[in-house]
């Protein structure tokens, strides 16, 4: 199936997907803990009958049961060597069931391992895992791909890149979101939509997370940004436990009624996930068959993103600053740190610039004495783990830009692409492949343009070439190419002409670097500020500048105010209030006469009495935590004081931010690992007697369940709080859990389960513990677990996440 054919199919929709596979196979006898793909191949008639029933119910696209048939998952069952054979046979089963009446989508999902820097799996290794599976299923005759039930945007990116590098089949991608509207990693539906459609996905959506009613709002949000069709595949409500059996209570008619609302909200591809049956799909098909199809946006919005934040660029919106500080040019201290492999200054520069109002951060690692590509990649990992601002990738080397774009977990900006043949011919296809925006630098092989007319001709040429290869005007920001007025008295005027031309004639946003305009002049800040305010009035959209220069930033806020831009009055007042609070009782110097800015490293200042150790944990500064701990020890603080007065309060604050959805899984893990480093350093210095040792806790993922991301985080957090944690791993029998708890005299047993099919193994542990006289408190958690389930099976408590688990354990042991 071609992408054009897929697009036409949806235009004639709504397109009906199938319903649940797993929950229906369990009803048919699939045991807990087996490899689903292997069981299906051993019981093919059950799978074929289920999918035949879906086709009879009106399904247009069947999901082949290749869901977890990737190398990493199959290896857990000792079946990795059978990957090709199994995937081919599974595709063939669905083709047999479809009988040409429905398309067959090769189904792919997450591997269960976390990507670096949160986990140990490297991005390129994950791409290879997906490529291996994609190659087989494409060759086996799959009509299209679906990448579903994803929690990590970066894993989605890896899958889409892998599939696009293997074949040209259409790709649908759907993520699963928490009740707060974000993934476990903090990505919202709008950000996921922008990133994945820019990367080349053919449909974007949501599956599994909730029942159909709760999917309406995320679908509406996606529809505001989507230039591709939207997919919705809800559960038949949320899972409930009745007499030890997981049930979904949304009936087929109610499901179909809600399905109509999803189509009205913008979904043009719709089906069912957990708990749905052919009856649900039949009712859904009947309910939506005559409904008009939502038409995606025909014009893209100019948007950059990180993994957790979206920044929209509009021609008449508020002025933006691209932070320029992460660049070693002229910064001797930064150069020295980079040569040593340290990114402490880079991390602090990122934090400072975000705090000072930068909307985007430029990242440049161009210097001698380092591996620039390796340093650029490491910097992207560090900065994206530290701040939420989207990044601007700045390098003179094509291969470095491509390497950075490949691993960047969002939609980045390239700085820059000119009309120089080497740059334009190589970088435009790279920008298109990775869905990036780019700054158009109006230079050619002949050098600088002689006048505005030549400059404008270069802009048009590059723009037309970008459109020719599949990009759009909305992917472009034009650099005004600022020259110094010392060499060209008309330099500023020519820039103003370019800004006006781009905005009014081409409808393109503009950017520039400010400092060139005043090169060689005294008191340059006045010239730069005057140039900026006039440039904004002529249509300048953003500038690459230092956001800590208050005179410049204040002028930008004031310019927006005078141009009556949206909420500019509120933004200006908030800015002035922030500065008044910052400088309360101090003398303000907006324009220092002398400034060695190139070598200044801002040190994290204490906030509300917070120590540098506290701040290092709060910000996840793994590179700086030990230095601060050593300083504290040298100043006379005792190891237990460092833990009790700095580390514990800091991780408590991280937990508060996590509860408020201001921090997400990446920040939580980064802070926890930072604290772990500090504790491991000071622990040998502690003088503890046995009475001071905290209790022992046995933690395990229950039998039949091979998911351990959440469990691993719980282990990390409990250890950081001083507990002696025995981690038994995943797929652990009840007998081993209870036996270990008795042997180690554990005060608490912690149980994890991701799947509804393995929830009841928790009850097995509770009952066996009672039978064996084990008086350990039992706490449980997992995606499908709730308080009522904990009460029903007789557990002592339920925790919704790792931070909550620490509080629960503390409370239970105080009783």
Annotate each language-model stretch with its function.
Residues 1-479, 483-815:
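Domain-level signal for soluble alpha/beta catalytic cores
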């Amino acid at each position: 199936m071609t992408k054009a054919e897929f697009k036409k199919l949806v235009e004639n929709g709504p397109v009906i997907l199938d319903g649940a596979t797993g929950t229906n196979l369990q009803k048919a006898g699939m045991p807990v803990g087996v490899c689903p793909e292997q069981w299906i191949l051993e019981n093919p008639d059950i799978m074929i009958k289920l999918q035949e029933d879906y086709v009879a119910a009106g399904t247009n696209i069947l999901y082949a049961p290749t869901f977890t048939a990737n190398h990493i998952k199959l290896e857990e069952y000792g079946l990795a060597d059978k990957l090709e054979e199994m995937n081919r046979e599974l595709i063939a089963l669905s083709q047999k069931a479809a009988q040409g009446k429905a398309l067959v989508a090769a189904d792919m999902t997450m591997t269960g391992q976390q990507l670096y820097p949160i986990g140990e799996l490297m991005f390129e290794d994950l791409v290879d895992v997906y490529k291996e599976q994609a190659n087989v299923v494409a060759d086996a005759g799959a009509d299209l791909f679906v990448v579903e039930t994803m929690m990590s945007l970066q894993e989605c990116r890896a899958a889409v890149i892998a599939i696009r590098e293997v074949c040209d089949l259409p790709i649908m991608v759907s993520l699963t979101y928490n009740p707060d509207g974000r993934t476990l990693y903090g990505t919202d539906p709008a950000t996921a939509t922008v990133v994945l459609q820019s990367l080349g996905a053919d449909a974007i959506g949501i599956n599994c997370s909730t029942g159909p009613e709760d999917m309406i709002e995320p679908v509406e949000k996606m529809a505001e940004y989507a230039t591709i069709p939207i997919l919705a595949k809800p559960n038949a409500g949320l899972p409930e436990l009745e007499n030890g059996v997981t049930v979904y209570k949304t009936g087929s008619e109610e499901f179909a009624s809600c399905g109509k609302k999803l189509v009205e909200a913008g979904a043009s591809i719709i089906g069912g996930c957990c708990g749905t049956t052919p009856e649900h799909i039949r009712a859904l098909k009947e309910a939506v068959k005559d409904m008009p199809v939502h038409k995606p946006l025909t014009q893209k919005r100019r948007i950059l993103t990180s993994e957790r934040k979206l920044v929209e660029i509009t021609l008449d919106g508020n002025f933006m600053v691209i932070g320029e500080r992460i660049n070693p040019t002229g910064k001797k201290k930064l150069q020295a740190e980079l040569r040593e492999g340290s990114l402490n200054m880079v991390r602090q520069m990122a934090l400072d610039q975000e705090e000072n109002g930068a909307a985007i951060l430029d990242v440049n690692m161009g210097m001698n004495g380092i591996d620039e590509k390796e340093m650029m990649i490491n910097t992207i990992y560090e900065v994206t783990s530290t701040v939420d601002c989207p990044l601007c990738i700045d390098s003179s080397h094509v291969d470095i830009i491509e390497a950075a774009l490949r691993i960047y977990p969002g939609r980045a900006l390239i700085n820059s692409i000119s009309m120089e043949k080497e740059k334009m011919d190589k970088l435009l296809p790279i920008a298109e492949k990775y869905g990036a925006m780019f700054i158009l630098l109006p230079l050619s092989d002949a050098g600088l343009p002689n006048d505005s007319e030549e400059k404008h001709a270069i802009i048009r040429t590059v723009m037309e070439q970008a459109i020719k290869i599949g990009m759009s005007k909305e992917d472009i920001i034009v650099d005004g190419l600022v020259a110094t007025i010392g060499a060209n008295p008309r330099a500023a005027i020519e820039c103003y002409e370019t800004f006006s031309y781009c905005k009014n004639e081409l409808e393109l946003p503009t950017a520039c670097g400010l400092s060139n305009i005043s090169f060689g002049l005294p008191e340059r800040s006045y010239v730069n500020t005057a140039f900026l305010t006039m440039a904004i009035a002529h249509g300048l959209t953003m500038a690459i500048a230092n956001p800590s220069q208050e005179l410049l930033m204040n002028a930008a806020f004031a310019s927006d105010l005078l141009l009556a831009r949206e909420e500019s009055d509120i933004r200006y007042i908030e800015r002035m209030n922030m500065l008044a609070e910052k400088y309360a009782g101090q003398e303000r110097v907006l324009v220092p006469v002398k400034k060695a800015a190139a070598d200044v490293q801002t040190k994290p200042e204490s906030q509300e009495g917070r120590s540098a150790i506290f701040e290092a944990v709060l910000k996840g500064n793994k590179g700086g935590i030990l230095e601060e701990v050593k300083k504290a020890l040298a100043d006379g603080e005792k190891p237990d004081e460092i833990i009790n007065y700095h580390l514990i309060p800091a991780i408590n604050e991280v937990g508060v931010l996590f509860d408020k959805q201001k921090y997400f899984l990446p920040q939580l893990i980064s802070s926890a690992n930072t604290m772990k480093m500090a504790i491991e350093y000071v622990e040998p210095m502690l003088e503890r007697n046995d009475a001071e040792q905290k209790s022992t806790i046995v933690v395990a993922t229950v039998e039949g369940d091979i998911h351990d991301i959440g469990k691993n985080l719980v282990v990390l957090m409990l250890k950081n709080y001083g507990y002696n944690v025995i981690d038994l791993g995943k797929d652990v029998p009840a007998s081993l859990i209870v036996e270990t708890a008795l042997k180690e005299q554990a005060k608490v047993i912690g149980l994890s389960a991701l799947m509804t099919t393995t929830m009841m193994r928790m009850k097995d542990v509770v009952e066996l513990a009672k039978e064996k006289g084990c008086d350990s408190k039992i706490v449980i958690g997992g995606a499908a677990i709730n308080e009522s389930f904990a009460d029903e099976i007789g557990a002592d408590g339920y925790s919704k996440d790792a931070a909550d688990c620490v509080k629960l354990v503390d409370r239970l042991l105080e009783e």
